[in-house]
Amino acid sequence: QKEITPISSDDLFIVLNHPNAKFDYPVHYHSDYEINLVMNTYGERIVGDSVEKFDNLDLVMTGPNLPHAWKGEIVEGNHVVTIQFSDKLLNFPILEKRLFSPIKQLLLDSQKGISFSENTMLAMKEKILQLTRMQGFHTVLEFLSILYDLSTADRHILVSNLYDTKDTIRTSKSRRIAKVCDYIEKNFEEPIKLGDVAALVNMSESAF
């Protein structure tokens, strides 16, 4: 299903801090980039057509509209930190500069999903946790530092070459349309509220 992320047009990025996460979110996708740090639990991670086990620590970056989910055990003290930022970042002119080319390649690679080595996860864990405690302009510097460190680290592409993100989105949209049509057909004799139909497909009224 499609997620409407809380990032606004005024945000360069947002940090979502979830101590004792419930891991009850279904497989979903959204138009933003995402860095997800999962700590102190174990379970199964789904990214596109990749399904892998993780244990204690996981760090993954996903690109726009790439379906993903973590099915973790609800272990006391588990912690999830998510950094989300707009897909428009890839079009920033600064990424055309030579020093930013590793970050641009990281963004391109993330469209297939990226996981990182244990050494990278351990190093980035502290930087990402530090970001959750920072405020103001210094958060921007730390965010760019995180992107650069990830861009120069060894990484593993998760999704197979055969996987088609656009096809997955088309299928998802078709299912939503079918669900809406079915609802209207069953309730056409009653007043139909926009909010009820939007909620049926997990969308806000404005997005619907």
Where does each model-flagged region fall?
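Short, structured helix-loop boundary elements
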Residues: 100, 121, 140, 170, ...
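Non-catalytic, well-ordered alpha-helical scaffold segments
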Residues: 125, 137-145
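Generic protein-terminus/edge-of-domain signal
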Residues: 1-59, 65-66
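Short hydrophobic/aromatic patch on the recognition helix
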Residues: 57, 207-208
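Linker/hinge segments immediately adjacent to helix-turn-helix/homeobox DNA-binding domains
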Residues: 144-170
